[in-house]
């Protein structure tokens, strides 16, 4: 082999190594289907993770015991609404939180919790007709928060509603519990039914969006969130944990991996992505970390003064289910209230539907 040929081979080898380092595609992420179990405070989640082919982003469907699946649930809803037999197209409006199924021009948004926890399906059609109201509220607040990050008192739509009064009410609750979170930097409205941030924006400007209208819709939805709900809390930030009633959906930032998404009902497991020069974390290890993270997060120690939204909501829910207090209002996390110190520490998220004084 001539000197020039050897030099060419060496150049190609170095080029290949460089490309591998840049693209990080030389470390294959190949995970076979596997059985999984998660034990969280006495509740056992079990099933099988199967590969779902998503180019460039390995995603695994976690099948849960006793759950029929989202598509089967959608077909039952279609039959209920008189659309049995029509062509069904699946569309993920927000892949982490929502499944939107479309029949023709008719939108039907729902949560699998409706069927899993026995909500009144006959009211879904009513929700479908009125859904633009709450969706509009959600879009407005999240757009303002993400786009401008204004202090909540400076957001025009808040000034036109009783939103500010309800925020002040929340701080009164926190103060009575001896918990100080500081002044919120900004506020985001969460659609408690399905996180529909991209829901049919053509309807957004066609309907009036008031809290009275949103409350009327939420009165329909509340049975979904009060039947069988163990915990419902949400946080926004770089380190994010969101526990939902039917789908224990956790997004955690860990060492050597990007945000991992795991569900325990309508389940997908997003395989951990490798970091620069790092080995991908095996799913079994990620699940073990997730299980440990869950158990640590949900433990509320006596005398805790720095309480995150997860711990606070869990404490409130335990008191509610244990009959320690019987409020005359419905509560659920609908506002995300952030302190000036950190956007990762949301305060209590609560809302009185009937306008009664919120005290326990």
Each language-model region and where it sits:
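Preferential activation on post-signal-peptide N-terminal prodomains/segments
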Residues: 20-240
């Amino acid at each position: 082999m001539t000197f020039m040929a050897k030099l060419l081979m060496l150049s190609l080898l170095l080029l290949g190594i460089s490309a591998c380092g840049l693209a990080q595609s030389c470390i294959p992420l190949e995970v076979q289907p596997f059985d999984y179990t998660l034990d969280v405070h006495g509740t056992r989640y079990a099933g099988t993770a199967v590969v779902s082919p998503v180019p460039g982003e390995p995603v695994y469907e976690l099948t849960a015991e006793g759950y029929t699946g989202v598509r089967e649930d959608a077909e039952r809803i279609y039959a209920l609404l008189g659309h049995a037999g029509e062509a069904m197209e699946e569309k993920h409006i927000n892949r982490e939180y929502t499944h939107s199924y479309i029949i023709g021009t008719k939108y039907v948004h729902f949560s699998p919790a409706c069927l899993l926890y026995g909500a009144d399906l006959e009211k879904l059609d009513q929700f479908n007709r009125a859904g633009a109201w709450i969706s509009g509220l959600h879009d407005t607040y999240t757009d303002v928060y993400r786009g401008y990050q204004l202090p909540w008192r400076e957001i025009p739509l808040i000034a036109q509603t009783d939103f500010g009064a309800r925020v002040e009410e929340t701080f009164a609750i926190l103060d009575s519990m001896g918990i100080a979170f500081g002044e919120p930097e900004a506020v985001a409205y969460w659609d408690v039914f399905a996180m529909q941030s991209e829901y049919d924006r053509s309807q957004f400007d066609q309907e009036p969006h008031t809290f009275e209208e949103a409350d009327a819709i939420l009165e329909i939805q509340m049975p979904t969130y009060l039947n069988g709900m163990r915990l419902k809390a949400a946080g926004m930030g770089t380190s994010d944990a969101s526990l939902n009633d039917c789908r224990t959906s956790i997004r955690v930032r860990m060492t050597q991996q990007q945000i991992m998404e795991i569900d325990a009902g309508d389940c997908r497991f997003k395989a951990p992505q490798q970091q620069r020069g790092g080995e991908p974390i095996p799913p079994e290890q990620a699940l073990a970390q997730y299980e440990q993270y869950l158990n640590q997060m949900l433990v509320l120690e006596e005398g805790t003064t720095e309480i995150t939204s997860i711990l606070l909501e869990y404490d409130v829910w335990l008191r509610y289910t244990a009959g320690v207090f019987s409020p005359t209002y419905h509560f659920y996390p609908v506002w995300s209230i952030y302190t000036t110190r950190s956007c990762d520490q949301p305060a209590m998220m609560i809302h009185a539907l009937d306008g009664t004084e919120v005290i326990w």
